[in-house]
Amino acid sequence: MQIAILSFFHYFTHMFKKRESIFEVEEGKFLSPKFDKNGLIPVTTTDHKSGDVLMHGYMNEESLKQTIEKKEACYWSRSRNSLWHKGKTSGFVQKVIDIRIDDDQDALWMTVDIGNGASCHVGYKSCFYRSIPLGIINDSEKVKLEFKEKDKKFDPKKVYKSQPNPTKL
């Protein structure tokens, strides 16, 4: 048992290359992600067919490892403070097609297949279902959002039942 634990620890701590030079980070062949002070890296997720942005989330070291190995999106939920296998509750699993990392390895872009499903806990295909109008802002009025997606893919009350809403005020 002790050997298995040590083997796992060795694998987990050596999965990503240590950041030792700017050249290696920018031009090197090894994954050396830069996690923030909370141990997170931002992830923008897009639909592999349409190119639409589906969501913005975060991964920690463990969720990135699970995503790579399972080929299904696993994020770090900041609201629940836990690993979040996307679609485990709703059934709308994100099948990973590609993961890219930016030039200084501090942000991820992931393309996924969601079939005919959705990525937003509100029920829309994308978490970016509203648009902010451009132009002159009238200081006496509030900026009104424009809905770009009209129809929800599912009813969140039926899917999530008694689970708490992750949106915080």
What are the roles of these predicted feature ranges?
Residues T45-H48:
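Short, acidic, Ser/Thr-enriched surface-loop or helix-capping motifs
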Residues I5-S7, Y11:
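Short, positively charged and aromatic/hydrophobic N-terminal segments
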Residues D52-V53:
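Hydrophobic "anchor" residues
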Residues F16-L40, M59-Q66, K71-L169:
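C-terminal binding/interaction regions
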